[in-house]
């Protein structure tokens, strides 16, 4: 077990869109406990027990009540995006890392005592039985690279019971990526999205039944995303409100149109 101390200089870290108060202290990361921090602790403890190296170690809770995690050295694709963000070999390595994570976490099961998710009125229903506790936030900021390959996943705040197909939808969203060029980072525009989706599905090892339904699932999840983002902005504020004010709702609706227009070509690429 890695030892740690509360002494030393705290260095602020750039988190994702909604994580605030993230700091590095020595060889550890301190982060405020989220609403599902106990699930995160249990998942990270399980991953350590099965020898999965691609995630932080949960070390405890400090005197300020923050989670203490091991710091994983490497590079992440913050903003502005680095030129290598569109590199297909890196993209494929992310898919392989996610598959390794999903295989490792599958033995953890799905806890029976998890509180039901808080869902806003009018949220479209989703028929997609969960298989494992997925990461569900495979953004460029949450993948640590070493020597040009994805080494570890960080930030498990959105971990929840999902299907493998839903994990791949999240992966495609950020790394294909899914959406109209004008809504993407400049470094990710003009790419052959159907081909990249196929590479991701192949690297992950997505089953044929899941390949046939993954775009239908992406459309359904994107529709739900608009309702969830609006609800979180209204009830949680903070980073959620900032993203909503910056137009994320409009981008989600634009992506919905793009998904519907491109679903057939991507499904063909995934299954041919």
Predicted segment positions?
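Active-site activation/catalytic loop segments of kinase-like enzymes and analogous catalytic loops
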Residues: 168-205, 221-235
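Catalytic activation segment of kinase domains across protein kinase-like and atypical kinase folds
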Residues: 117, 122-128, 132, 139-178
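Amphipathic alpha-helical interface surfaces
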Residues: 97, 146, 164-167, 193-197, ...
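Actinobacteria-biased recognition of intrinsically disordered, low-complexity terminal regions
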Residues: 1-18, 261-272
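Short, surface-exposed acidic
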Residues: 206-216
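ATP-binding pocket architecture of kinase catalytic cores
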Residues: 9-135, 146-149
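ATP/Mg2+ or Mg2+-diphosphate-binding catalytic cores
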Residues: 225-272
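Short, polar/flexible loop-turn hinges at active-site or ligand-entry regions and domain interfaces
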Residues: 80-84, 160-162, 179-184
């Amino acid at each position: 077990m890695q030892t740690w101390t509360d002494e030393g200089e705290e260095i602020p870290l750039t988190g994702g869109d909604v994580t605030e108060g993230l700091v590095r202290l020595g060889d550890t990361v301190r982060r405020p406990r989220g609403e599902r921090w106990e699930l995160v602790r249990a998942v990270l403890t399980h991953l350590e027990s099965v020898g999965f190296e691609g995630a932080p170690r949960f070390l405890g809770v400090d005197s300020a009540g923050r989670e203490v995690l091991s710091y994983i050295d490497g590079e992440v694709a913050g903003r502005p995006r680095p030129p290598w963000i569109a590199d297909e070999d890196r993209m494929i390595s992310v898919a392989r890392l996610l598959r390794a994570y999903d295989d490792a976490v599958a033995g953890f099961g799905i806890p029976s005592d998890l509180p039901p998710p808080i869902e806003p009125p009018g949220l479209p229903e989703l028929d997609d039985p969960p298989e494992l506790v997925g990461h569900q936030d495979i953004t460029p900021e949450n993948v640590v690279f070493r020597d040009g390959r994805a080494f570890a996943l960080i930030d498990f705040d959105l971990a929840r019971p999902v299907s493998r197909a839903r994990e791949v939808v999240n992966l495609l969203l950020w790394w294909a990526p899914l959406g109209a060029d004008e809504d993407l980072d400049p470094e990710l525009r003009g790419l052959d999205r159907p081909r990249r989706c196929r590479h991701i599905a192949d690297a992950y090892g997505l089953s044929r039944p899941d390949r046939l339904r993954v775009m239908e699932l992406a459309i359904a999840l994107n529709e739900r995303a608009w309702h969830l983002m609006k609800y979180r902005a209204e009830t949680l504020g903070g980073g959620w409100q900032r993203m909503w004010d910056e137009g994320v709702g409009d981008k989600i609706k634009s992506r919905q149109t793009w998904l519907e227009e491109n679903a057939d070509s991507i499904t063909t690429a995934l299954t041919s």
